[in-house]
């Protein structure tokens, strides 16, 4: 069975530094579980790790697709499983590091995307329907077949609405039912999982997030978005809807001021961190590490190593 170490947590909590230190001590390689860092050219807004910051540790699933290409949890699972096997086959420890909870769950709950993968014709039909009758109409189709998704999703979130309708068409089940059934396959995975979630005082975390946004602006986030626009990447693309990118696009289009854009990026990032923590709390397998209780990161690293070895 393959040993798999997972270092998760909210944005700006410090997953990168901890995972690199663990990789150095455990002879590991890191697989990124970040839904934005998979895109090429989107470096500043995604807080993508630099080559120097990697400290010689190989990183996987960073810069793997162009910004116009679609990438989803099924794509991640396929590539991550391939990387895990490759790393393990070379006598090294695969370390998953990131904050996209769905990506992590696709591995440790062995989500099966083969039965309900895609129905392109149905997707095209629903997209055309939204253009003809409006997003609200397509959203209303959920009411009778998947009330939970109907209440949870907004009409403007067309991509997720279409996905929920697609899953129901293929399986006859709501997307939440389908997910629960996949989660029952928990112990069918070929991994010995050690799952840690880093956390810290909420106010301190929010301060770190605000500071990170200021640093991004100083590094040239606006210039990065301008360059992406000049390369032909548009606001309707999945990648350009990421936090930081969509707000700067609003600013560049004259819809909001620069101060408003910065405010919205900070607010959106804080809200995202809150959602991440809520997601991770649902998983009873995860072991939480409160960073506030430690003076040095090395203490956290040593604690994780001890817990892994004592398991």
Curated annotation (Swiss-Prot):
Ranges for region Interaction with substrate tRNA: 34-37
Oligomeric form and interacting partners: Monomer.
Annotated binding of ATP, by residue: 9-16
Protein name, as recorded: tRNA dimethylallyltransferase
Cited function: Catalyzes the transfer of a dimethylallyl group onto the adenine at position 37 in tRNAs that read codons beginning with uridine, leading to the formation of N6-(dimethylallyl)adenosine (i(6)A).
Catalytic activity: adenosine(37) in tRNA + dimethylallyl diphosphate = N(6)-dimethylallyladenosine(37) in tRNA + diphosphate
Top-level enzyme category: transferase
Sites marked Interaction with substrate tRNA: 100
UniProt-listed SUPFAM superfamilies: P-loop containing nucleoside triphosphate hydrolases
Keyword field: ATP-binding, Magnesium, Nucleotide-binding, Transferase, tRNA processing
């Amino acid at each position: 069975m393959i040993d798999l170490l997972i270092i998760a947590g909210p944005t700006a909590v410090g997953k990168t530094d901890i995972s690199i230190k663990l990789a150095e001590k455990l002879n590991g390689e890191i697989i990124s579980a970040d839904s934005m860092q998979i895109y090429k050219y989107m470096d500043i807004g995604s807080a993508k790790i630099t080559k120097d910051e990697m400290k010689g540790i190989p990183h996987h699933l960073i810069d793997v697709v162009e910004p116009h290409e679609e990438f989803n949890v099924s794509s991640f699972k396929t590539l991550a499983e391939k990387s895990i096997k490759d790393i393990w086959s070379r006598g090294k420890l695969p370390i998953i590091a990131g904050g996209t909870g769905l990506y992590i769950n696709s591995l440790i709950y062995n989500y099966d995307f083969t039965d309900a993968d895609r129905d392109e014709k149905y997707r095209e039909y629903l997209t055309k329907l939204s253009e003809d009758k409006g997003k609200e109409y397509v959203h209303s189709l959920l009411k009778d077949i998947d009330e939970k998704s109907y209440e949870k999703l907004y009409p403007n979130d067309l991509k997720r609405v279409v996905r929920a309708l697609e899953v129901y068409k293929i399986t006859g089940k709501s997307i939440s039912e389908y997910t629960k059934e996949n989660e029952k396959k928990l112990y069918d995975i070929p991994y010995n999982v050690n799952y840690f979630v880093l956390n810290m005082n909420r106010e301190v975390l929010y301060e770190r997030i605000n500071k990170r946004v200021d640093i991004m602006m100083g590094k040239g986030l606006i210039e990065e978005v301008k360059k992406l626009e000049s390369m032909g990447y548009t606001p309707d693309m999945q990648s350009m809807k990421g936090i930081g990118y969509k707000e700067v696009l609003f600013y560049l289009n004259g819809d909001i001021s620069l101060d408003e854009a910065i405010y919205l990026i900070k607010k959106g990032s804080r809200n995202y961190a809150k959602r991440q923590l809520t997601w991770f709390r649902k998983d009873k397998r995860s072991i939480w590490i409160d960073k506030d209780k430690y003076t040095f990161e090395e203490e956290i690293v040593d604690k994780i190593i001890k817990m892994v070895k004592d398991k």
